[in-house]
Amino acid sequence: IPLIDYENHMSLDSIMQLQAMSEMMKTQVAAYSVSRIMVLGVAGGNGLEHIQKDKFERIYGVDINSSYLQTVIQRYPELDGSLKCLCINLIDETDKLPKADMVIANLLIEYIGYMCFQKAIQQVNPKYVSCIIQINIGDNWVSDSPYIHVFDDLEQVHHQVEEHTLEDAMLEIGYHSIKTLEHMLPNEKKLVQIDFERQHPICLNRLEKV
């Protein structure tokens, strides 16, 4: 999908998703005391404007689309030296992911599925994971707009993500939810942010015994 079409669609007054995601990411990057942060599915870098360079030792931006990553580098020269963009296909290249203290994954799990996301998190091994998923109150997962047809091919890989199923999938790999926030959108959709923390091994042992 051309980035300009994607961002124009997401920022329409009838959708307002780009603006909402930026505001939510502002709280995500400020929520925890971490030094290495990773944004999976960084796309054009929406929300990176809220990152204070001196707060993080390293910021990883990961995406499958190399042209998106080039745009990120051009848009955020102030993050030069801290920001490292990585072109990685999360379906079959999770072993290339470096370690980080926190992972942010917004509107990503819908396109890679729970199992692939589990593999990525196990590879990165962060203390915190913050996800934003989209819940469709209406019938369509893509809102009507002049740009709707650029999403046609995505329907083949789109998975509907459910809050409780995601929580169960994360618990399987040792992460429990610690925070949930909701943001209503004007198009019969809502964004749900779920934050997870890696459990201490002692806690995991107790769970296994129960």
Language-model segments: residues:
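Class I (Rossmann-like) S-adenosyl-L-methionine-dependent methyltransferase catalytic domain
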Residues: 1-95, 115, 119, 130-210
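A short SAM/SAH-binding and catalytic strip from SAM-dependent methyltransferases
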Residues: 101-115
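Short glycine-dipeptide loop
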Residues: 124-130
